[in-house]
Amino acid sequence: MRILVSNDDGFHAEGIQVLAMELRKIAEVIIVAPDRNRSAASSSLTLVEPLRPRHLDNGDYCVNGTPADCVHLALNGFLSGQVDLVVSGINAGCNMGDDTIYSGTLAAALEGRHLGLPAIAVSLDGRQHYETAARVVCDLIPKLHHQLLNPREIININVPDLLFEELKGYKVCRLGYRASSAEVIKQKDPRDETIYWIGPSALPEDESEGTDFYAVKNGYVSITPIQADLTAYHSLLSLQNWLEQEFTK
């Protein structure tokens, strides 16, 4: 098996290096990742400047682009040979609930899905036990690879920041919800000009049993299938009825 590994925290982040080291015990691995932190880049592509992949001595690449750029280039450009699976992570911090809208970690996996490959995104609910998340991925891949990895979906995995032996198990979950985002942070720069920072993530609003928030909070690895189709199917009929009523008066 040949695995393409990417992330949004950047090539030099601890999470991706720990993940690649563990995956190389079970597969051939090549990293193609951003050359710096690209957190919250979502699925953005770079269209107004050239992308410059830098080939490193060990065969990996870092790119002056977004996570989606990295996977797009790797699978649709310069990377030769067959790739069987895309794994994105390990993200420093969870990607649960509404986080998935912004996540560059998920975006890298979704780009792999868009290009026809099964893909996994993995995040750690903290910044300490990356080796736990890496072991979780290596434990799941042989079980998932041939059966449940649909090229039209990705698997989103969130791991509690615990020792591997302290994990309570795995739970298949839906996404939870966060409350409205916190206010932006207003400051003054050294020139006394006003600047703003995006505030921290809001607290969970729906962390009921069955959600990814609930699972991770209670020591379980959450596993959530994610699709790119954003259609609200439950609203199609009501919108169709509204359209017919409003325009047939």
From Swiss-Prot:
Q: Where in the cell is it found?
A: Cytoplasm
Per its record, the protein catalyses: a ribonucleoside 5'-phosphate + H2O = a ribonucleoside + phosphate
Q: Which residues bind a divalent metal cation?
A: D8, D9, S39, N91
Query: What's the top EC group for this one?
Result: hydrolase
- According to its UniProt record, what is one Pfam family this protein matches? SurE
Requisite cofactors = a divalent metal cation
User: Which note does the record give on the cofactor?
Assistant: Binds 1 divalent metal cation per subunit.
InterPro entries xref list: SurE, SurE-like_Pase/nucleotidase, SurE-like_sf
The EC number of this protein is 3.1.3.5
Task: Report keywords, A-Z.
Answer: Cytoplasm, Hydrolase, Metal-binding, Nucleotide-binding
Q: What is the first-listed, main subcellular location in coarse terms?
A: cytoplasm
> What's in the GO CC field?
cytoplasm
Q: Which GO terms describe its molecular function?
A: 3'-nucleotidase activity; 5'-nucleotidase activity; exopolyphosphatase activity; metal ion binding; nucleotide binding
Q: Does the keyword Metal-binding apply?
A: yes
**Protein task:** Nucleotidase that shows phosphatase activity on nucleoside 5'-monophosphates.
Family assignment from sequence similarity: Belongs to the SurE nucleotidase family.
- Name assigned to this protein: 5'-nucleotidase SurE
Native source organism of the sequence: Haemophilus influenzae (strain 86-028NP)
Taxonomy of origin reads:
Bacteria, Pseudomonadati, Pseudomonadota, Gammaproteobacteria, Pasteurellales
